[in-house]
Amino acid sequence: MNKTIILLLISIIFEIVISSSVDGNYPAGGLYFGVSSNFLVGESEKFTQYVQDELLAMDLPDQSGDSDGVQYSFTHFKLALNLQDFFYAQLGPGVFQMGWDTITFNLQWEYEICVKKVVKLCESGTITVYTASGQSVSLGTTLDVLFNSSNAKIEATSTVMPFEAGAVVASVHCTDSVCLIPINDIVSEVSSQFVSQVTNGVTKAINDKAPSIEQLFTPIKQIPITMDSGNQYWIDLEGCLVEANYSSNSPSTITAAINGGIVLENTDGNFVYPTQTPSYVPYDSQMESFTSDYCITITGYFIETLLDAVLVPEFPMTIQPSQIPASSPVQLNTSSDFFSGIAPNLTSKYPNVGIQVNLMPPTIPTVTINSSAIILTDFEISTSFLVLTDNDDAIPVFNVLFKFDAEIQTTLYTDSVSVFSLNSTLLSITPNVTITDSNVGSVDATGFVQLIEMAQSIIKIPSITYPVPSKYSITNVNSQLGDQIIQLTFDLIENSTNQKYLKKSVNLNLKKKKKKK
């Protein structure tokens, strides 16, 4: 997108073809990234296997030392471990816990113990520390989840392994004929060290995976639009994670609810935040009824702030006669057929001179969405028409206020397995043109209206392309308009395996309906 697109409105006027988790837990916002329960089941299985593998690969070196006159040597550590019943839960604002309700392990090693009093006594054998059958041992990690305006940060801060007395058992098997040396204290110390290794290992494993988790919930950070001004456009990522409110599944569907407004970064490096605030609060049924892997929900606030950030800074703007293509049926000249038809006094008073058009910053429209279209209401732009004299003076001749209401239809396309684009088509445009003042007598506003109506078919709304999280490819893509929302749904295929773990049909329920508690 470039300055040509900003000229679109005035170009249309001249018929110029220009290339170009309880109800209320979901905050008002512009964007929501939802990950379904079914997808998370598959991901949790892979994540569980990953953590298990990391723990089983832990370095368990031989140990030796002296404790209260007892010399010990521990060698040949062997570990078996299994994690089951993955869970996550929200503990408070920005704080989650994830883990496994059941962990079983069996840690075995060989020992040799020596004590020297009158004579030196030694014994050897094996020690086994294991989870007792029928006892409950769990593993839980606390996560700090922060969505600030520019980034998402997920960090595992600590892991605990709580269990009751008797849940973890230590067994000593002495292989010598005489076994008299007490070693319980040393065994307890080694067992405690092992628990610390496991909990620290889980914390590290989760933090190593945190960037890919963050990307899943914030796949889009920047809007890929290029303007002549050099401005850049970022998404305000401030927000939170929200669990599905009434889910019987575990893990439940989870959504990153973010502000979703567009933040302008100008060439000076300054950031300009939206003046609008989000107002629409989605309903549970809108956010949680999708059965595909992934759902992006867009509200009117996102579109309003996008228009505001992209269009307003490019104004005021001036269009000169030289900018109009020679092939255009309408030229910025007082003697052209168009201007002599709508303003005869202009032509007689200033024959065959150029016309300059000044455009003021537009008033951004209100955006509403229904099941049929995206509706833009009260989009306004003021323009001044000036004649250019031989002395290069610009003399005001009349001013025009253009108001537009428009309906847009949106379709989701997959440009590749890693990229999708949102393509929009103008269904209708309703112009309202007012001549606010004139220094050349009567100006026929209907001439502008007719040109705009005839030009509807040539209006091309630029499509914007977005990447999916880099770890995945997409399939089963679908888009649908609902009550004040646009929803884009698709299934995800992990690139490393190129196999779908869970594949569900798309069945969106977008009715405006609150669930009963």
UniProtKB/Swiss-Prot annotation:
Compartments where located: Secreted
Keywords for this protein: Glycoprotein, Secreted, Signal
Superkingdom, taxonomy of origin: Eukaryota
Principal location listed in the UniProt entry: secreted
Coiled coil: none
Residues carrying a glycan: N148, N245, N333, N345, N370, N423, N432, N495
Pfam families reported for this sequence: LBP_BPI_CETP_C (PF02886)
One GO cellular component term: extracellular region
InterPro entries: Bactericidal_perm-incr_a/b_dom (IPR017943), BPI/LBP/Plunc (IPR032942), Lipid-bd_serum_glycop_C (IPR001124)
GO molecular function: lipid binding
Signal peptide: 1-19
Protein family (similarity comment): Belongs to the UPF0522 family.
Record's protein name: UPF0522 protein B
Source organism of the structure: Dictyostelium discoideum
